Regions:
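C-terminal amphipathic alpha-helical
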Residues: 114-129, 134, 281, 353-450
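Extended, regular secondary-structure scaffolds
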Residues: 127, 132-261
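Short acidic alpha-helix initiation/capping motifs at coil-to-helix transition points
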Residues: 356-361, 450-454, 462-469
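Extended, charged amphipathic alpha-helical segments
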Residues: 230-394, 398, 447
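Activation/maturation switch segments at domain boundaries
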Residues: 458-519
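Charge-rich, acidic-biased intrinsically disordered regions
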Residues: 19, 144-151, 298-325, 387, ...
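Short coil/turn segments at secondary-structure boundaries
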Residues: 121, 135-136, 283-291, 378-383, ...
């Protein structure tokens, strides 16, 4: 990070010390996401000889699991972006964005593999606090000073340490620098894009640098030309980037970057790993042991070594318990196993404390899950636990409320990004019929909050009560169109037409009589 800050300062974009210091916290959160924090997971123990050796604490890696779950809840391939304007404009704009309205595997989003990219980006957002989506022109050309392109592509910077805010206020980051590194012919390079706001749009500056190792840890750099002849700068008519941050207030530092969803739950992450490590150690140390009299063990031949004075001294002898059995199974007790009972061996089977360890792990999982906004019962340390969507909805109100809260930020970002895509499509790709003023709707995946079995049963009950018709059931759950569904159920007449003909007949039409001659 130091080299990035140095380059930005030399380019005329100094970064405040407070913002620079914040990146150490991002690195700490990223270590937890990876599952290994050296100062916590590495420790030392002493063996029977009094010598210390380094060991590694066992990990549940719950930080990554939490971020994966948040990403699946907020942005996945069942999320849909829909636009609505005049009929012709809607079709053209929707096709440019997503290819079609249902699958949405085409257009700008499909060509950018956005649903896969977006899901991974949201996972990193909740781990590190910040990610950035930005727009890039596909096959740009300049003709008579005018920039045009074939299409638009969505890219992402998922490493928060490569996102540097330049101009910002309490609500938004308006100017930013994005960095990425690449290696060519064994040499290290850095590419920096600077997005500067102007009166009408944004000016984008591209900078390329070769990173040189000077001496020791010192790093230098030199400016190089663009590898593929990219433009040094160009202008776009809209804001070509959006910043995603978890929708929680930053209580760690007054900076424009976001904070990890588990930033205030580090103690809980440590407790989970401690509990799991204790379970592992109890299992490891709970093996059967046989304490044996020395007379039952064959000894290796006496070995000698020279001391500092050149004298031969015997080396400590170890019991030869055989290569096929684990050494820790047998423990030599010298000449007597027990002072009270003269015997040659004694078996010892320690308790594994399975129930206590499971309860300890579950308790810490509940604390962690609740602290990260997923509700207390999100994770069950048991393979025998199954919960229906109705039970989730009823027992985990905290999760439901947290999801709605986080979707606000996702919806705002996707709406802004979508509108910028449409503007670039119209202004730079020259696609006629695109309407930047469309109404944009983000449809999120709500399957986790719905219980299809219960909904089917309720719909059947409403059909029996006469509230709904049978064809409506086939349309919803069999995917048939209305005409086919009516034909399959024999309900070919539209109820509205039946009411019209019965109670409001046209002139010359006889009113249908009831069973007792009443109209």
């Amino acid at each position: 990070m130091r080299i990035l800050f140095t380059i930005l300062k030399d380019l005329g974009y100094p970064v405040s010390q407070e913002v620079q210091d914040y990146y150490s916290k991002i690195q700490f959160w990223n270590d937890w996401w990876k599952g290994y924090v050296q100062e916590f997971h590495k420790y030392q123990i002493k063996n029977e000889s009094g010598n210390s050796r380094e060991v590694k604490r066992k990990q549940m890696r719950m930080a990554k699991k939490i971020c994966e779950d948040w990403a699946d809840l907020l942005l996945n391939d069942k999320t849909r972006i829909l636009v609505e304007c005049n009929e012709h404009g809607t079709d053209i704009t929707q096709e440019f964005l997503t290819g079609d309205k249902e699958d949405q595997n085409g257009g700008v989003l499909g060509n950018s593999k956005f649903w896969k990219l977006g899901n991974k980006a949201v996972e990193r957002e909740f781990a590190q606090g910040t990610v950035c989506f930005y727009l890039q022109l596909v096959k740009p050309t300049v003709n008579k000073g005018q920039l045009s392109a074939q299409s638009v592509q969505i890219k992402a910077i998922k490493d928060a340490q490569k996102i540097v805010p330049l101009t910002y206020d309490e609500e938004d980051i308006s100017e930013i620098a994005l960095a990425s590194e690449y290696t060519q012919n064994g040499e290290r390079f850095m590419y920096i894009q600077v997005f500067k706001q102007e009166q009408e749009g944004y000016q984008i500056y591209n900078h390329y640098f070769k990173i040189n190792n000077v001496a020791g840890d010192a790093v230098g750099y030199e400016r190089v030309s663009a590898p593929n002849g990219e433009a040094i700068s160009y202008k776009l008519p809209c804001k070509p980037f959006v910043i995603l941050k978890p929708n929680i207030e930053n209580n760690i530092a007054d900076v424009p970057l976001g904070m990890s969803i588990y930033a205030n739950a580090i103690d809980m992450l440590e407790s989970c790993d401690l509990a799991y490590d204790n379970l592992f150690m109890d299992t490891l140390l709970g093996k059967k042991k046989i304490f044996m009299d020395q007379a039952l063990l064959s000894m290796k031949p006496t070995a000698y070594a020279l001391n500092d004075k050149g004298e031969k001294v015997p080396v400590k002898q170890e019991p030869d318990v055989g290569a096929t059995l684990e050494k820790s199974l047998y423990v030599s007790t010298g000449t007597q196993v027990s002072p009270d009972k003269p015997r040659l061996f004694e078996e010892y089977n320690p308790s594994l404390r399975v129930d206590e360890n499971k309860e300890n792990v579950q308790f810490n999982l509940n604390l962690l899950s609740s602290k990260c906004g997923l509700g207390q019962n999100r994770y069950q340390f048991s393979i025998q636990n199954m919960t229906t969507a109705t039970q989730v909805r009823a027992s985990n109100k905290e999760l439901t409320e947290s999801v709605w809260k986080q979707r606000i930020a996702i919806q705002d970002a996707l709406t802004e990004l979508t509108r910028s895509i449409i503007i670039l499509g119209k202004e730079k790709c020259h696609i006629s019929g695109l309407d930047p003023d469309v109404r944009i709707t983000i449809q999120f995946d709500d399957t986790m909050f719905s219980d299809e079995e219960a909904e089917r049963l309720r719909m059947l009950q409403e059909i029996s009560a006469g509230i709904l018709q049978k064809w409506e059931y086939r349309v919803r759950y069999y995917g048939e169109d209305e005409e086919t569904a009516r034909e399959m159920t024999g309900e070919t007449e539209n109820p509205a037409d039946r009411i019209q003909s019965r109670f409001f007949p046209q002139e010359g039409t006889q009113i249908e009589e009831g069973p007792e001659g009443e109209a």
